[in-house]
A protein has these predicted regions:
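Short loop/turn motifs that connect adjacent beta-strands in outer-membrane beta-barrel proteins
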Residues: 59-69, 107-114, 147, 247, ...
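Outer-membrane beta-barrel translocator domains and adjoining extracellular loop/strand segments
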Residues: 22-25, 86-87, 128-132, 164-168, ...
Length: 458
């Protein structure tokens, strides 16, 4: 839509393998999205070319009156043999201002609709128990061509989805897994409210269809309940509807899990609204999770801002609030990025998550009860004299301090890294870190008998 709200990337290699991604908040990349498009390449004697077919309905777009519409665009070629890229605009996806720097492009305006239906029927039979399972359902994707889009999944079957990588995690921090189910990756960028480095996600769609709620002590056949615990829940229904207007975007998401013999499915709801001002975006997201088995519910509210009105400065912030039966939590994250040119960048940030903040019923929170200050400097150079051996240099220094909300300070830290890329395709990575002494409450899980471990200087 040309308002630097979200960008979509389409990539094809010489072997015709495809990749796509979305970019928000400057250059926050997500590879979860899987668009409906195709591309092919042709290799000649001393050249190769590529051709992309991107349907007009591949992404939701605002309705525009008139014969022309404005978009932002970049064409990029990566020469893997030389590890070198060529772009139609002087920017790339590693820069914090990537989608703000794209060139305006005026194209013919079209309006088209696309309605897609994917019914399914599966039959499974166990030859030992002679049990037979039949399932039928349908996925519906409706692009109305006026900036609104509706996705519906009735009794969906996610059995064909690729499995996650095996992760052995003994830490107190939950491993975050990205979404792979097409229904939840399609048309989802409006609902993405997240912190940097996976600090938090207000909506983590992997919770939907997750492990059911159990309390086997409620049942006389508790041993049968224990032996039949499932790691996932089937879905009865999922619905998402989004509307894109000139000044505001709106979205609604709902999902309902199936009941089973020893549990009842949960219900999930989310409502999203966001302004479309190119220089000052303000959004609000509300979620509700209802546990029908425990007869409990949880609510989360978030307010997010993204401001680029001040020259060379990007300001982003989030206010978080969670409410459960007996607790209310609060959170704040704030970042200021100063980018005077393509060689230097400075980020100053702060976040505060109190001990009662809980996003994990429908979202993801890496850890609560934490205060963090950080400052990051980046020094890049992408051009050197012809006689120089170097092609580029990327350097950054990070300074940080974390503590619990009651003042237990973790070690202060300094981390620096430099990446040197030579014209001979030889690369050198140099890194160094140093920490002061401090208290680590993460290792002991804040056990009352040993609330922290004293960490010495490193």
């Amino acid at each position: 839509d040309g308002n630097s709200k979200v960008a979509y990337g389409f990539t094809v290699s010489l072997g015709d393998s495809l990749a796509d991604a979305t970019y928000t908040n400057g250059n926050s990349e997500s590879k979860d999205w899987d668009g409906d498009w195709i591309a092919r390449t042709f290799k000649g004697n001393n050249f190769w070319s590529s051709e992309f077919f991107i349907p007009w309905t591949v992404v939701p777009m605002q309705k525009v009156d008139g014969p022309k519409r404005n978009v932002k665009f970049i064409a990029f070629r990566w020469l893997a043999s030389d590890e070198f890229g060529f772009g139609s605009t002087k920017t790339n996806w590693e820069r914090e201002t990537f989608i703000y720097d794209l060139e305006d492009l005026v194209i013919d305006n079209y309006q088209s609709k696309k309605y897609s239906y994917f019914p399914y029927l599966t039959v499974a039979e166990d030859s030992v128990t002679n049990e037979s399972i039949q399932k039928a359902g349908i996925d519906i994707f409706l692009n109305h061509g006026d900036g609104s889009q509706t996705n519906i999944a009735i009794n969906p079957d996610f059995g064909q989805v690729e499995t996650d990588q095996v992760v052995v995690n003994f830490s107190a921090i939950e491993t975050f897994f990205s979404e792979k189910r097409a229904f939840f990756t399609e048309n989802h960028s409006l609902f993405e409210v997240k912190g940097g480095r996976d600090d938090f996600y207000v909506i983590n769609t992997r919770r939907i269809g997750g492990r059911p709620d159990y309390d086997c002590s409620r049942f006389e056949q508790s041993d049968i309940c224990e032996n039949n615990r499932k790691e996932y829940s089937d879905l009865d229904l999922a619905l998402r509807h989004t509307i894109q207007k000139e000044k505001v975007d709106l979205g609604f998401l709902a999902a309902s899990e199936s009941d089973e013999n020893f549990s009842k499915g949960r219900d999930y709801f989310a409502f999203r609204v966001r302004s479309n001002s190119p220089q000052n975006k303000v959004g609000f997201l509300a979620t509700k999770t209802k546990s029908n088995f425990f007869n409990e519910s949880s609510d989360v509210y978030s307010l997010d801002i993204e401001n680029t009105a001040v020259k060379n400065t990007q300001i982003s912030g989030y206010l978080l609030n969670s409410r459960k039966e007996n607790s209310t939590g609060h959170g704040l994250r704030f970042d200021i990025k100063y980018i005077p040119n393509d060689k230097y960048e400075n980020t100053v940030g702060f976040h505060y998550f109190d001990k009662d903040l809980d996003l994990n019923d429908m979202g993801y929170l890496q850890r609560n009860d934490q205060i963090k200050f950080y400052n990051r400097f980046e020094f890049d150079r992408n051009s050197y004299p012809k006689e120089s051996l170097l092609r580029s240099r990327d350097s950054h220094i990070s300074i940080f301090q974390t503590m619990t909300t009651d003042g237990k300070k973790s070690p202060k830290g300094v981390w620096t890294k430099t990446e040197l890329s030579f014209k001979s395709n030889f690369n050198i990575d140099l890194s160094m870190s140093a920490k002061t002494e401090g208290k680590d409450t993460n290792i002991t899980r804040k056990y009352i008998g040993s609330p922290y471990i004293q960490i010495m200087d490193e």
